[in-house]
Amino acid sequence: MNTKSIRFILGWILNIEALLMLLPVATAVVYREEEGIAYALVMAVCAAAGALMTYKKPNNPSFYAKEGFVCTALGWILMSAFGCVPFMLTGEIPSFVDAMFEMVSGFTTTGASVVLNVEELSHCTNMWRCFSHWIGGMGILVFLLAVLPLVGGSNMQLMKAESPGPSVGKLVPKVRFTARILYVLYVALTVLQVLVMLLGGMTFYEALCTSFGTAGTGGFGIYGDSIAGFSPFLQWAITIFMIAFGVNFNVYFLLYMRRPKDALHCEEMHWYLGIIVAAALMICANAYDVAMTLEGNLRQSFFQVASIITTTGFATTDFNLWPGFSHGILVVLMFVGACAGSTGGGFKVSRIVIGFKSVLAYLGAFLHPRVVRKVKFEDKDVDGETMRAISVYFTAAISLFTISVLLVALDGFDLVTTFSAVAATFNNVGPGLGVAGPTSNFAAFSDFSKVVMTMDMLLGRLEVFPMLMLFYPPLWKESIGEARIRRNRSPFH
């Protein structure tokens, strides 16, 4: 394994994180908050560590899938570890387990929180929490690819390891330009939302924090009631933007290239929008509140469905109080998730649809054994390798999810709380049901359960395999063997 290349890229991740910490520092300056000193200190340490790790560029630029997985997993852990330090230095989240949980929740765009009252946090800390969603939404490594020429051959491996969905491809021939296009679209949509939020009456600080949380489909808020205190106009606007950020960004690229027919022909988007409309109407009928207008009921239903399926996690109502049927729909949506190639989490609509079509094809084979039935998606035959990858992903994800539920169950909470809390963290949704519901948080769980769910958030955001690779013994045995061979070949040995 090429450890020097991994070290080099991890160093650049710290350099980028140091640069990004300028925003909470600037926020502290604007609001004259002493907490900004902690962010400035950590920013300096990040920059120093990054400079040391990138001082010498690796001579051997070879970089393969295993390095991509390891670098991605270590990068997210390292970024979260440095990012959580200001929480402890300011005393706002003094426990390392809690601070790490909060920061991982931010970067993985989960939005699950252990903070009892977010309104008591400093402006700079709330800005950093919300900004972490925006950073993690598209991915720190995709940002790195957009702005820096990395070691040879590493670009596609890093993008595959970090990008959500069953496959990742290039929008243009060079991966670096693909990353740039993705970020230009991401920034453009974010700026558009900020402008709409300002138009709806938000302050610039509120608009920026809310837009960061929406764009990254994260869900950290700056008020205890999340989005409930804002006007109906803003709630509808946020609903639309949540849905928009849950769409595959290839669709926006096609629109930018003036190919609207190709963009609107996206099968995954059709399923995604259809699921949203169907789920919202069913919840509206099931949880209809006669004390509210039809518009109010529709607004709450569409908002919560959009929030859960895109794994954003904002709330305008306490859906803990909804009937059991509505709870069931929300839990299913947690697993379905948004589109591949979006900033959303979950299993992804494309995987669910391909899996559903595979079951139908398998059943059809029993009726007509001699007929070759191929699974089609986006007007193309799904190849065997993609089918195998999806099956392996489902098996690994469900197995890890089950283990996590059993471990968190040791806390003694009811099954609804335990199951939904793990589902909310594994699928990067944020709020669950019961004790982990939208009006509560995850502070009541033990440190052990918080560590388990912190791992779940990383597993879910990186789609299992990069994190699993860190615990795969043959990888490290092979790396140790390669190191011994290099040492034996050294003229100084």
Describe each model-derived feature in a short phrase.
Residues 1-493:
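Membrane-proximal intracellular helices of multi-pass ion channels
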